[in-house]
């Protein structure tokens, strides 16, 4: 059995670690609330854009935009949103596992996959497994702006415009609540039609002013940007929630470990006292 001094040292070490994890839990909780506010502010815009585009996909358009036309699929692209920091439980790895399964489905059909990464964890993971990373951005902090993440978006849109990609997806964690974050893969291009049953059996004619091509070019690119930005802020809120939960679990586990070590310490101390008493009694008997 370890000595009492060694056990006391272990208890002090766990207590120090517990203070760190408790502080990280509180910081994550504060950041999560701010991230939720940003997410709530941007979500209505992103959802409205999705509805408008879904409505548009059912319309009889006088100008058929490139982003509305289905193609034979030979290569697909993924915009992958991950975190820059760790200590957030299985948030990243669950997302990566889902994406790897999706990519395997395509590669089994002979379709190649390109990856544009947002977040350093995704970059390091997919570089290690041999993924074809064609663009990346990292270190965006806790309050990312669209201008910071537009680089990978432009790379993938250019590839789609030039016919080097036939489908484009965004991969991110959707924030449900503090205890639940769901890895999602959503199609960006070609634009998916709305799944609203009321729209499936209707069609519309649109009038554009001043020019349908210029209007649709701007609108559809803005749609893609809005969905990517929403994916980033949702993933950020998911990250802070997952980190808060992970740090709380670490703090609680530290408390349990301290109790176990305290019990071991008490037993060691009791054994030491018993041994000392035995030695005293033996010495007295010898005299």
Swiss-Prot record:
What subcellular locations does the record give?
Cell inner membrane
Report the SUPFAM superfamilies cross-referenced here. ATP synthase (F1-ATPase), gamma subunit (SSF52943)
One GO MF term attached to the UniProt entry? proton-transporting ATP synthase activity, rotational mechanism
Sorted alphabetically, which PROSITE patterns does this protein's record hold? ATPASE_GAMMA
Membrane-topology descriptor: Peripheral membrane protein
Q: Which GO terms describe its biological process?
A: proton motive force-driven plasma membrane ATP synthesis
Q: Any keyword RNA-binding?
A: no
Record bears the keyword Metal-binding: no
Write out the entry's keywords from A to Z. ATP synthesis, Cell inner membrane, Cell membrane, CF(1), Hydrogen ion transport, Ion transport, Membrane, Transport
Superkingdom, taxonomy of origin: Bacteria
Q: Name one GO cellular component term.
A: proton-transporting ATP synthase complex
**What InterPro entries is this protein classified in?**
ATP_synth_F1_ATPase_gsu, ATP_synth_F1_gsu, ATP_synth_F1_gsu_CS
Q: Which family, according to UniProt?
A: Belongs to the ATPase gamma chain family.
Q: How does it assemble?
A: F-type ATPases have 2 components, CF(1) - the catalytic core - and CF(0) - the membrane proton channel. CF(1) has five subunits: alpha(3), beta(3), gamma(1), delta(1), epsilon(1). CF(0) has three main subunits: a, b and c.
What is its biological role?
Produces ATP from ADP in the presence of a proton gradient across the membrane. The gamma chain is believed to be important in regulating ATPase activity and the flow of protons through the CF(0) complex.
PANTHER family in the record, alphabetically? Answer: ATP SYNTHASE GAMMA CHAIN, ATP SYNTHASE SUBUNIT GAMMA, MITOCHONDRIAL
Record-given protein name = ATP synthase gamma chain
């Amino acid at each position: 059995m370890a000595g009492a001094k060694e056990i006391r040292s272990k208890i002090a070490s766990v207590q120090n670690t517990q203070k760190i994890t408790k502080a990280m839990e509180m910081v994550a909780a504060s950041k999560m609330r701010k991230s939720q506010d940003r997410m709530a502010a941007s979500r209505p815009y992103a959802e409205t854009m999705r509805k408008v585009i879904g409505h548009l996909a059912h319309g009889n358009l006088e100008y058929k935009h490139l982003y509305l036309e289905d193609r034979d699929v030979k290569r697909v692209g993924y915009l992958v949103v991950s975190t820059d920091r760790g200590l957030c439980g299985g948030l990243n790895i669950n997302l990566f596992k889902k994406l790897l399964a999706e990519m395997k489905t395509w590669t089994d059909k002979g379709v190649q996959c390109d990856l544009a990464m947002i977040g350093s964890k995704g970059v390091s993971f997919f570089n290690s497994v041999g993924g074809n990373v064609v663009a990346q951005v990292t270190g965006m902090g806790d309050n990312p702006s669209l201008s910071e993440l537009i680089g990978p978006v432009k790379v993938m849109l250019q590839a789609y415009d030039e016919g080097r990609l036939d489908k484009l997806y965004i991969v991110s964690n959707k924030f449900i609540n503090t205890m639940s974050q769901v890895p999602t893969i959503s199609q960006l291009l070609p634009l998916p039609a709305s799944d609203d049953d009321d729209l499936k059996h209707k069609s519309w004619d649109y009038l554009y002013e001043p020019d349908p091509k210029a209007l649709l070019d701007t609108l559809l690119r803005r749609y893609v940007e809005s969905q990517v930005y929403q994916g980033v802020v949702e993933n950020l809120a998911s990250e802070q929630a997952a980190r808060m939960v992970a740090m709380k679990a670490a703090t609680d586990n530290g408390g349990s470990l301290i109790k176990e070590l305290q019990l071991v310490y008490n037993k060691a101390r009791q054994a030491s006292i018993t041994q000392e008493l035995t030695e005293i009694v033996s010495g007295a008997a010898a005299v």
